[in-house]
Curated annotation (Swiss-Prot):
It comes from Bacillus subtilis (strain 168). The lineage of its organism: Bacteria, Bacillati, Bacillota, Bacilli, Bacillales. NADP(+) binds at residues 189-194. This is Glutamyl-tRNA reductase. InterPro entries: 4pyrrol_synth_GluRdtase, 4pyrrol_synth_GluRdtase_dimer, 4pyrrol_synth_GluRdtase_N, GluRdtase_CS, GluRdtase_dimer_dom_sf, GluRdtase_N_sf, NAD(P)-bd_dom_sf, Shikm_DH/Glu-tRNA_Rdtase. The record marks 99 as: Important for activity.
Amino acid sequence: MHILVVGVDYKSAPIEIREKVSFQPNELAEAMVQLKEEKSILENIIVSTCNRTEIYAVVDQLHTGRYYIKKFLADWFQLSKEELSPFLTFYESDAAVEHLFRVACGLDSMVIGETQILGQVRDSFKTAQQEKTIGTIFNELFKQAVTVGKRTHAETDIGSNAVSVSYAAVELAKKIFGNLSSKHILILGAGKMGELAAENLHGQGIGKVTVINRTYLKAKELADRFSGEARSLNQLESALAEADILISSTGASEFVVSKEMMENANKLRKGRPLFMVDIAVPRDLDPALNDLEGVFLYDIDDLEGIVEANMKERRETAEKVELLIEETIVEFKQWMNTLGVVPVISALREKALAIQSETMDSIERKLPHLSTREKKLLNKHTKSIINQMLRDPILKVKELAADADSEEKLALFMQIFDIEEAAGRQMMKTVESSQKVHSFKKAESKAGFSPLVSE
């Protein structure tokens, strides 16, 4: 079995691609369930945010896993593999584990140390648990990822003066307007990104806040928290005529503000400039808005400069986080090694108990007049002998699992005791047990036995 990550992120793909390869929150459960039916996929979790869409999977073979995940993404988003492939990133085995931990800690984010991604990883983990698309390996891996993410923010200063993409949007507004106390801010979208933008703006002492959302009650809840005004979506055009700054993050599948709508709003603006920041993926604001006089449009990719300026101190703190990640990688590898040893120990016990059972059958045939009590006594003592004989080999095989060359040593151990085939069967049982609802018949069988995730 192997751990594999396939996806796109802000480093590998421009926003035009990321918005095409983005799962809506209400699609994640269905997507994970559908993906688990693909050949080679044993466990899977999908993490999809404005800056990344990544599939984490346990696969039986790396090459088939890569193929079927690429096929799944292309089919789901109705893209050709040729369109998608140049932007995909791949992480395998140890690199995949390290990548997940870096993501959970915020080290792989556009804004280093941001906390929002940890919540998104945790939410995807919960969804996968509910939909039963994960088993033994990812239950442990993602628990450790969430734990190291929490430790990062508890034990280091990387989250101090917390920033995010929405914070960067506010910073950009400050650079353009200076003091925001007299400005009218329009927030389009009352989701998490809109909420973060409102929080950051509130900290800057803004003049007036208006919140618009498809669901009016949700807009009102957010507006009330910051003494603002809520409006319905059909009032968007009039709100655009009044605002100085627009921050948009609805997550809609099509443009919410069109060029035509803004042209109508501009007639009432009397030449006043409008600063617009689109932090949604897919984008909310038509790029053609940039052609209009007095409109200054920025999208999520334009925020990189602001983000970079705020990150120097966090990069220094990131070195401490790297140490936490290294510790957690070691812990996970030790756990994986122990997991790999379980089938070996089970196979050894199985063989020893089979010998004990055959011996008891032979004794009972040769001594037919043994009483039930005598048979039970013999059975108990022969099993005791077996357990005593197995004690040292089992302790030794557990020690071998911690060695750097454990895979080769375990293979030799199995060869000495002639239990390769039995260990392979035990590993199959482990996989099937961890995949309670996954039909293992769909995965290609793999000859031999590999107790570890390959290096």
